[in-house]
Amino acid sequence: MDKSSTMLVHYDKGTPAVANEIKEALEGNDVEAKVDAMKKAIMLLLNGETIPQLFITIIRYVLPSEDHTIQKLLLLYLELIEKTDSKGKVLPEMILICQNLRNNLQHPNEYIRGVTLRFLCRMKETEIVEPLTPSVLQNLEHRHPFVRRNAILAIMSIYKLPQGDQLFVDAPEMIEKVLSTEQDPSAKRNAFLMLFTCAEERAVNYLLSNVDKVSDWNESLQMVVLELIRSVCKTKPAEKGKYIKIIISLLSATSSAVIYECAGTLVSLSSAPTAIRAAANTYCQLLLSQSDNNVKLILLDRLYELKTLHRDIMVELIIDVLRALSSPNLDIRRKTLDISLDLITHHNINEVVQMLKKEVVKTQSGELEKNGEYRQMLIQAIHACAVKFPEVASTVVHLLMDFLGDSNVASALDVVVFVREIIETNPKLRVSIITRLLDTFYQIRAGKVCPCALWIIGEYCLSLSEVESGISTITQCLGELPFYSVSEESEPTETSKKIQPTSSAMVSSRKPVILADGTYATQSAASETTFSSPTVVQGSLTSGNLRALLLTGDFFLGAVVACTLTKLVLRLEEVQSSKTEVNKTVTQALLIMVSMLQLGQSPVSPHPIDNDSYERIVLCIKLLCHRNDEMKKIWLESCRQSFVKMISEKQLREMEELKAKTQTTHAQPDDLIDFFHLKSRKGMSQLELEDQVQDDLKRATGEFTKDENDANKLNRILQLTGFSDPVYAEAYVTVHHYDIALEVTVINRTKETLQNLCLELATMGDLKLVERPQNYSLAPERSMQIKANIKVSSTETGVIFGNIVYETSNVMERNVVVLNDIHIDIMDYISPAVCSEVAFRTMWAEFEWENKVAVNTTIQNEREFLDHIIKSTNMKCLTAPSAIEGECGFLAANLYAKSVFGEDALVNVSIEKQTDGALSGYIRIRSKTQGIALSLGDKITLKQKGSS
């Protein structure tokens, strides 16, 4: 039998106390030394030591002591020691303590009486308790409430013993009388608890006869009342109507704990709209009134559960839920937004967006550290609202565009992605968005935000004025050309006597010029304009945000600038009738592109231009020099069509996910029938009628029946020993979120009784055994079940191994049967999850642990291999289907999952098909902790070869 521990005491194993030292201290007259010795003895007992020689010493020298601390420690000691022999009979020496316990129960000091009564609550031996029953009963009438409340608990514990009802035949009647006369709140609560536990009918009768007074009862008593109601309604569901009235009355209680329990009880007992609405309102009120963040998070979890099961009712309370955003805690705000976004409808969208806009404005105050992160969450929420309900986009897009220059790059990136989607899905807003973007473009200082903003300018500037404004804005943000002077180039290259000539492909003519020191140098025509220093003055329009970024070596941005200018020039050709103006603009664009190439190949630049950016800019130069209709169509139409296709796929994916969620809805074709008219009312309240209707619907739709998958249960059984071993063992493994439960069936296959049989387990990885192994006796050819709990603290592949050790009467030595290892699968702890591309990239950059697994598989199709990896790792593919379809010989995809411990698992699959048809490449796993990266890597290595 597993023993329940009533205390936890720290014990330093490095300094074990010797039994003789303890004995000497106990025999002395020093009270402090006795206290210290008793503590050491208790610690030894708690850690599995048996010190039987101390028992008589304690009876002689400790039992008579009047010191309260010693008496308390004595009771702890008596609780811990073994009181029975191997056959379950009480040891004869235990009778010695009965007289002392009786004396304590009649002691003039109420503390001694109280702690002794509390000790009796934990006594399971009827032979020890029986002689004490008269003294226990006398304490029911003691003047002090501390004694009375513990006397009631002692009677309850004794009454629950196997033969307890014979020791206290009329205990329920006595306690019922006590309950009617008792004035102490705690004693009254204990009395009601005793009736609820031992005589439920009496408790119910007392409750129903005092219905009007329930709301005035003490908080602890009200909590027991709710527990009783839950218990009664499970066994007698037909009677829950009258109890729900009591719960509704308790919703107005002063105690927050009672109100919370009332709401939970209502939800568990009834699915009637009135009951659910009352519970949801209660949670929302508590959410605003409670200051503890942990309490708020628990309440949000309850609201999330209600949203999942009763969305229609929760929709009415969305504004109440959103009020939780007033909390400065980011976790609370994130959960609040997650719940609210699923409750948005056409009726409440305007209110919700208005509230979110107010919150965005509040973040500009800059008082809190994490305002940027909170603003990012709000922007993402508004984005989701605008995608679901395009009509609200016009009310928020201009407000959010003020944050394009936000110092929080992630927040600014979310804004620009939002603007990009809205300008495509809401054509009416195109003109106002472009105008606002061109006006505020100079404020954008983030290298990740500028490319997206430039793409929007290149794609959506359609009229002549817009195209000209777009080109003008880009030119101003680049500043004066070139990006450096020749004198600046010579400074970092003092070791070189000559200035490296610029490639002839980039210049049209050369001529000698006189430098500042009087020497001659060759200069290209591209450098004939006034020289400007690469020093950037922040915040000024003329300094140019694009210029500043280019001078830091961001040539990917340079390639985007070149592409945007190319698109604008091609569109200018269509809307501008004057060829002269077009040619001027082409020349200006070419000058900018050549200057960027010149900067990229100059030692002034901190980083040389990369090949991809170089080729892209050169392509733009060639295109502007040799324009044709086919290229114009590709640049002006095909790029936009690709984006439109991407948005359409995203919307389709979201619709499919929404459909998948709503497939579990319980709406039926006959929902419109008013069942109330078919019921005989019989004085039933509205809530009772609703509840009965809901139960009928559940019964009709089969919601009350739940099938157990026995086949699945059998699959979890692991064989631990061989059939030829003297002891056969198999384990059924149940994996919970934070622990693993092992149910080990042990069969004695011999003709002898196995004594001191013990299941010894050990773990490897982040697994910990919760309890100490117990010894058992197993009869010949009999079986027994041994349970073991193992705590899991992280997502890491763990191993459980061990032995079964036993003794027989014939052999003095212990026999050992080695068990097969039990491997705990990481797949039990991770589940597919979704995150934005920006969030994925941010985490990818931040996470320090990476595990790189080489592709080694017999699968020859790229998509088939990816699907196999997704299935094997239980992850979600974040890459759009359109990006990975087709036969192009290579594939790259991102996968994401989350563990039950909140850990993120990121996987990037990059594969290429070789000429012989085999796949090669790498699967890279990144995570914050080493365990999940290694475990996932091992899993992929194991699974990637096969197709099963």
From Swiss-Prot:
One Pfam family, short name: Coatomer_b_Cpla
Keywords: Cytoplasm, Cytoplasmic vesicle, ER-Golgi transport, Golgi apparatus, Membrane, Protein transport, Repeat, Transport
Intervals holding HEAT repeats: 49-87, 92-126, 127-164, 274-311, 312-349, 391-428
GO cellular component, one term: Golgi membrane
Any GO BP: vesicle-mediated transport
Entry keyword annotation includes Zinc-finger: no
Main location, first listed in the record: cytoplasm
Record's subcellular location: Cytoplasm; Golgi apparatus membrane; Cytoplasmic vesicle, COPI-coated vesicle membrane
Membrane-related topology note: Peripheral membrane protein
Subunit structure: Oligomeric complex that consists of at least the alpha, beta, beta', gamma, delta, epsilon and zeta subunits.
Biological role stated in the UniProt entry: The coatomer is a cytosolic protein complex that binds to dilysine motifs and reversibly associates with Golgi non-clathrin-coated vesicles, which further mediate biosynthetic protein transport from the ER, via the Golgi up to the trans Golgi network. Coatomer complex is required for budding from Golgi membranes, and is essential for the retrograde Golgi-to-ER transport of dilysine-tagged proteins.
Annotated protein name in UniProt: Coatomer subunit beta-1
The organism of origin for this protein: Arabidopsis thaliana
